[in-house]
């Protein structure tokens, strides 16, 4: 049921939060700049009007979601810290200090699924509007500056919260699924293979030792055979409504060497994960999905979109479509690195990449191109901040939906923190 609006505030013997707190604090100023009514109007129709318990206020849930990514903490931690931090409570619309937790951590999960990708994109759009209000929209002669119509694009990998995948590790996990499913469903297995698996683990422990290649390969083949037998036996005996069926079907595909959507299975609980090789010396392979980030010359992120493992040049059109939805100014020039070669334009937007200067280019034009691509390199540290400060380095949300919303929430948190810094100059927030 939709939340009940509070029309009456009981008088208190003590001062309210607005009287207690410093209204020049960055969180206080950010709370005043955000148009919370936009979220109320967009999310209220998603609740049932006359059935069920009244829900937690929309501003509270949206504020918790923003604070989680701004402060880079988990659902459980933001709920705990909210009860201890008066500025968090004021940011979420509270008028009196509350010493209790506002909700269960699982309610944030339900709220994210309720608002969906479009709701998270609305939060990103509001973060752009908050920053766009402070930007100069014309030069001294009344013309729009190029900073509004020029953008830079780059891609990075959003790693999923999985361990490094190996066949041995995933086969053992499939066997563990089988043992747990049999215990929960009261199915008696013909053979559990527990003793044999223990011996195989001992053999596979010395995988990197000399003269052990053949015996370890033999143990791998035997483990795959055991996993296949157990999975097929359980699939035959499990009832149709068992919650274990989807997981065991994925496990059977892995045991048989099948693929999902054209790629191998690297995780049994996150089968959509793909392997991406970006040519890094530090990390040869990354397991997750590709994301596209677009920023303006002033450092404002105006586009954040999730993909699978497409070629960089094929992400331009969809990224610009998102920008047209959430950014109020048209993008006339989009600069990328050499990974975006192959596409020179998208609609009214010209796409440029670093290249050898033409013989007809004047020295002024060469200097201008050089300055543009030097400015483009500034997107790299922004991606670094998204990963280290706003939860883009490790995606804890589940499935393709989690891939999509995590990158947008990280970008929105970066923009909100940028607006907070603007209130206090270059001091640390």
Which stretches of residues belong to each language-model region?
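Helix-centered, glycine/charged polyanion-binding patches within enzymatic domains
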Residues: 332-401, 405
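Trp/Phe/Arg-rich N-terminal binding region typifying the photolyase-homology
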Residues: 46-58, 72-113, 120, 139
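Electropositive, glycine- and tryptophan-enriched low-complexity nucleic-acid-binding patches
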Residues: 280-326
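Basic, short loop/linker segments at the boundary and entry of helix-turn-helix/winged-helix-like folds
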Residues: 27-66, 70
């Amino acid at each position: 049921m939709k939340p009940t609006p509070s029309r009456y505030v009981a008088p208190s013997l003590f001062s309210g939060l607005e009287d207690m707190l410093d209204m020049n604090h960055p969180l206080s100023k950010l709370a005043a700049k955000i148009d919370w009514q936009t979220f109320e109007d967009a999310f209220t129709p998603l609740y049932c009007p006359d059935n069920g318990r009244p829900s937690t206020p929309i501003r509270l849930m949206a504020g918790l979601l923003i604070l989680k990514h701004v402060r880079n903490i988990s659902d459980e931690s933001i709920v705990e810290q909210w009860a201890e931090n008066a500025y968090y409570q004021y940011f979420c619309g509270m008028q009196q200090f509350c010493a209790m937790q506002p909700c269960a951590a699982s309610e944030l999960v339900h709220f994210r699924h309720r608002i969906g990708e479009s709701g998270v994109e609305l939060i990103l759009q509001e973060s752009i509007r908050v920053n766009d209000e402070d930007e100069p929209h014309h030069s001294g002669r009344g013309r729009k500056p190029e900073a509004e119509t020029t953008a830079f694009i780059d891609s990075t990998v959003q790693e999923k919260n999985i361990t490094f995948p190996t066949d041995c590790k995933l086969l053992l996990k499939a066997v563990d699924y089988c043992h747990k499913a049999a215990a929960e469903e009261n199915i008696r297995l013909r053979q559990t293979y527990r003793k044999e698996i223990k011996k195989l683990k001992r053999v596979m422990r010395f995988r990197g030792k000399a003269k052990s290649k053949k015996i370890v390969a033999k143990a791998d083949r035997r483990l795959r055979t055991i996993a296949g037998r157990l999975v097929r036996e359980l699939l035959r005996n499990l009832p149709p409504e068992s919650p274990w069926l989807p997981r065991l079907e994925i496990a059977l595909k892995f045991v048989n060497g099948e693929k999902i959507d054209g790629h191998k299975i690297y995780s049994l609980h996150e089968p959509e994960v793909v392997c991406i090789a970006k040519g890094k010396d530090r990390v040869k392979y990354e397991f997750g999905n590709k994301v596209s980030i677009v920023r303006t010359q002033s450092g404002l992120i105006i586009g954040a979109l999730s993909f699978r493992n497409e070629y960089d040049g094929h992400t331009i059109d969809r990224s610009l479509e998102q920008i047209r939805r959430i950014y109020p100014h048209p993008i006339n020039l989009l600069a990328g690195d050499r990974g975006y070669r192959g596409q020179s334009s998208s609609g009214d937007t010209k796409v440029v990449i670093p290249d050898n200067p033409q013989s007809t280019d004047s020295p002024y034009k060469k200097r201008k191109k050089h300055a543009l691509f030097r400015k483009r390199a500034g997107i790299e540290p922004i991606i670094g901040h998204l990963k280290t400060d706003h939860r883009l380095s490790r995606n804890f949300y589940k499935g393709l939906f989690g891939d999509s919303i995590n990158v947008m929430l990280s970008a929105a948190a970066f923009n909100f923190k940028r607006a907070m810094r603007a209130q206090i100059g270059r001091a640390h927030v």
